[in-house]
Design a protein with these regions (language model features):
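Juxtamembrane helix-loop-helix connectors linking adjacent transmembrane helices
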Residues: 1, 23-88
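Alpha-helical transmembrane segments in multi-pass membrane proteins
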Residues: 1-22
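Hydrophobic alpha-helical transmembrane segments of polytopic
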Residues: 3-6, 10, 41-44, 116
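Helical transmembrane-bundle signal
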Residues: 10-14, 49, 163
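Hydrophobic membrane-targeting alpha-helices
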Residues: 16-17, 21, 49-57, 122, ...
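Residues in flexible loops and secondary-structure boundaries
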Residues: 17-21, 33-37, 112, 131-133
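C-terminal ends of transmembrane helices
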Residues: 19-26, 92-96
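Transmembrane helix-loop-helix hairpins at the membrane interface
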Residues: 45, 61, 73-172
Length: 172
């Protein structure tokens, strides 16, 4: 629960700072829509495919990853998981894509894609090497989509799904 509160507090502080600096905050707000949800579902599956292609060759013979232990020990209820996924998905995509990727676009597409993807991977390293590879694949797919469309809702929705689905599959 502290993660939800800390992300909300940090988001409010960051948005307040950006607003004081004259940044158009409205451009950072994802606009939910049915079409965006469908695209987000496609992004989810596309990221899963890219991640599978990247990670599978390295997965054989690997010891249990830290993320596997964390998932096995997690005892959150489904409503808490959904709230955490909504807050976390919006928090990460708004700042990594909506702000950082957009701010870096003037330095070229490679920088606008690479820096947010590497920042994303850096704070997911606790998941272990295979988890970091998954995060790299997912982050790159989301960044490519955003660079092409400048739409935030589909990556936010895909991220929310990415955070919820492992718990649903684990419990089924």
């Amino acid at each position: 629960m502290w993660l939800i509160v800390s992300e909300i507090v940090l988001a409010c502080a960051a948005l307040g700072f950006l607003r004081l600096r004259g940044f158009a905050i409205a451009s950072l707000l994802p606009t939910p829509s049915l079409r965006g949800g469908i695209v987000g579902l496609a992004l989810f599956f596309g990221a899963w495919l890219v991640g599978s292609l990247l990670v599978t060759p390295f997965a054989a013979g690997q010891p249990e990853q830290p993320i596997d232990r964390m998932m096995a020990e997690a005892t959150f209820s489904m409503p808490v998981i959904v709230v955490m996924a909504l807050v976390n998905g919006a928090f990460e995509e708004v700042f990594l894509l909506g702000f950082l990727a957009r701010a870096l676009r003037g330095f070229g597409l490679g920088v606008a894609l690479g820096v947010p993807t590497l920042v994303r991977v850096s704070y997911h390293l606790y998941q272990g090497p295979l988890g970091a590879m998954w995060v790299f694949a997912v982050g790159l797919v989301f960044a490519l989509y955003f660079a092409r469309t400048v739409q935030l809702w589909p990556p936010v929705f895909a991220h929310v799904l990415w955070d919820i689905v492992p718990f649903v599959l684990r419990d089924s």
